[in-house]
Amino acid sequence: DRDAKLAQADGKIPIEEFEYKVRRLINDYIRPPKNEYKLDRALWWMDRFKKELRTDVRIANKHDLFKAYEVENIIHCAAMSALASKERKESRWGLWHMRSDYPMKDDEHWMKHIVLKQGDSFDDIRISYAPIIKM
């Protein structure tokens, strides 16, 4: 139950410090230039942050609870971004998706959308592809 977070009033990490740490690590590992190592590290950190948010973060009041929901969503979006970036083995769209380990554009294999869909659980993210429809 998400509201059980209110029982974490004795957590060691204030939610504001935790949010700062999450945002800093996202900036370090998910922003361009990207590569497999950085994206793997990002996914490792997002998994760790999900666990820390449940066990170590201090949530003393409703304000902290709403902040925790926001940080939880930030972690989830960052994990999806890292997964999609890791899946695309090329560089495309200028700086937005520049991969140092795949520096060239590859229309033959990657002229398609990467579609992420959440499955039955928070951690179940499914990857599929969709064609680009030119109008």
Segments from the language model and where they lie:
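Glycine- and aromatic-enriched mobile tails/lids
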Residues: 1-135
